[in-house]
């Protein structure tokens, strides 16, 4: 298949953030207009009995209060405008994905590694369902960092049943990031011809067309390094989870769409597909707790 891919996104518009900062600045001006006179002449000055230290302490608290309110207003304005902007521009934004949907990847044969990361939390049924991909050139590998024998036995039993490869290491250096790097940066894998990597968490279930859908993005746009799917909460066992998942499920398409079109999108740690050359040029996952965000920054 001839590669005719072009760059995605182009230069992103700053309009949303100009509006956001303008609204926030007006709110800050209002609150500081109210607080500044209190800094100069505190309304409680008469009750301090001329104690200068007490007055200074009170003014410091007022300043901190104003700063905290200003900061939380910034987050509130951001979330409010994200929702409103998405609501009124949704059709226009979704039209940009038409090119992706029309991209034909039926003749693509790139090798895709599906890396299932687990550490004392193996869920065989979730992995089994995730492995039912319509894409024929995918290989699943279990990266097992488990220390408890019962979970190791579950992994080994699953591997015997399905023929899936299991990779373990001597220590847990770097935790999840180190686990992935240990495998992908091994001499054997570096000599192989894989083109993409899918990162799976232990209880995650991806749909059968996940790889095919992600490949459309990579073949539609040559500068896509990570395709991050939205997460949907499906295992809601009590009232709180059933109520909370409504907000979570609506958050991802709204928040991620706005960040993608007007800001900086980041990997969410799993449910994502990564282009090999981008992973290698970034030097792998940084050995930090927020390895997904750090890798996104490195790739950026």
Q: Which functions belong to the PLM regions below?
A:
Residues 289-295:
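Acidic donor-binding loop at a coil-to-helix junction in glycosyltransferase catalytic cores
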Residues 110-113, 139, 294:
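Cell-envelope/extracellular polymer assembly enzymes that use nucleotide-activated donors
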Residues 136, 144-154, 170-173:
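A conserved acidic beta->alpha catalytic loop
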Residues 112-120, 133, 217:
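A conserved hydrophobic helix/loop-capping motif in glycosyltransferases and polysaccharide synthases
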Residues 1-106:
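N-terminal membrane-anchoring/stem segments of glycan-assembly enzymes
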Residues 128-137:
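Short, acidic, metal-binding catalytic loop of nucleotide-sugar glycosyltransferases
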Residues 159-160, 168-196, 208-289, 300:
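Long helical/loop segments within the catalytic core of UDP-sugar-dependent glycosyltransferases
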């Amino acid at each position: 298949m001839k590669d005719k891919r072009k760059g995605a996104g182009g230069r992103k518009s700053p309009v949303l953030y100009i509006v956001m900062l303008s609204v926030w600045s007006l709110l800050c001006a209002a609150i500081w207009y109210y607080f500044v006179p209190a800094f100069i002449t505190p309304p409680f000055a008469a009750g301090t009995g001329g104690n200068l230290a007490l007055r200074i302490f009170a003014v410091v608290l007022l300043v901190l209060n104003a700063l905290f309110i200003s900061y939380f207003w910034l987050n509130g304005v951001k979330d409010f405008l994200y929702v409103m902007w998405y609501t009124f521009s949704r059709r226009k934004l979704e039209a940009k994905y038409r090119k992706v949907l029309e991209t034909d990847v039926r003749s693509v044969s790139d090798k895709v590694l599906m890396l299932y990361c687990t550490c004392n939390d193996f869920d065989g049924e979730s992995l089994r369902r995730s492995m039912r991909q319509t894409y024929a050139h995918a290989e699943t590998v279990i990266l097992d960092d488990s220390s408890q024998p019962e979970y190791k036995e579950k992994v080994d039993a699953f591997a015997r049943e399905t023929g899936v490869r299991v990779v373990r290491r001597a220590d847990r250096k770097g935790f999840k990031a180190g686990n992935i790097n240990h495998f992908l940066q091994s001499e054997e894998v570096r000599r192989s011809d894989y083109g993409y990597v899918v990162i799976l968490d232990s209880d995650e279930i991806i749909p059968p067309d996940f790889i095919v859908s992600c490949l459309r993005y990579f073949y539609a746009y040559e500068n896509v390094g990570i395709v991050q799917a939205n997460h949907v909460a499906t295992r809601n066992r009590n009232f709180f989870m059933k109520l909370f998942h409504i907000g979570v499920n609506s958050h991802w398409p709204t928040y991620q769409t706005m960040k993608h079109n007007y800001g900086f999108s980041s990997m969410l740690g799993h449910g994502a597909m990564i282009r090999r050359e981008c992973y290698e040029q970034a030097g792998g996952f940084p050995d930090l707790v927020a390895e997904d965000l750090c890798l996104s920054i490195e790739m950026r």
